[in-house]
Amino acid sequence: MAPTGGGTLAAVHPIERLRYVARASGVDQSLLVQETASALGAFGADPAGMVTACRRIVHRHPACGALWWLCGRVLTAGDPMPEAWRAADEIDADRTAVELAHALPDDATACVLGWPDLVGEALPRRGDVEALVVDVLGEGSGLVRRLLAADVEAVDVATQGLGAAAAAADVVVLEASAVGPDAFVGVAGSRAAAAVARHDGRPVWLVAGVGRLVPQRVWDALSGLVDAAAEPWEADDELVPLALVDQVVGPTGPQPVADALKRTDCPIAAELLVDL
């Protein structure tokens, strides 16, 4: 990927691009990383400005593990911009959705919440799988329409049916926006779905793509910001113990949790760990 390559905001000035990224919500992590990498190009000759820009981005999107990963790589690199583009290329080449599509059991019924980026990319590849899509944050209905258009059997489940859907599924497939050493950030309802599945003996798979696993110090800062964003019962995201997860699906396929955590590769940039 070249710094001058096309993108959704290719003709926009980098400063305006950065403002867009900071304001964006409901945008998938891949796009956020690509647009942030491009926007940071405006600060190539301004190290202090780059630090401030990175801090503002991760504080605006604290649940986005891939942005912490990108900004950590940029701020700890000897040559920041080539590192930013390498990170964007790695996100673009992420095989997690492909591996998830391959790994799902034949003719399985999968319970998913909302419209997760990678899960939503994987399911249309599997016409034999039925999806019970819980309409969390009002996003599930859109995924159901997408799946039906791809000839994938899908059921639009109201939020009050979350527990029943988790108990009825062959596998509960959750997606992490960030993963720490002992917990992950998932969409609201993830903890309840995982707990019901565990109680009923259903496997819980956690989907965590490139850049979403972070070390303890970064996790402490990230999870603290997520916790402080809203009252727990009003938040769009929540912290879920990894003890409720059976397998983590990443770019090399499903792994036990302990093995998956070994691919944590987010650098620790001290500049990101202080309050704005």
Residue ranges and their predicted role:
Residues 136-276:
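Conserved phosphate- and dinucleotide-binding cores of soluble alpha/beta proteins
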Residues 36, 40, 119-123, 143, ...:
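Buried hydrophobic packing segments
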Residues 51-52, 56-128:
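Long amphipathic N-terminal alpha/beta scaffold segment
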Residues 3-86:
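Long amphipathic alpha-helical segments
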Residues 112-115, 134, 175-176:
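Short His-Asn-centered micro-motif
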Residues 43-49, 78-79, 128, 200-203, ...:
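Short helix-capping/linker segments at secondary-structure and domain boundaries
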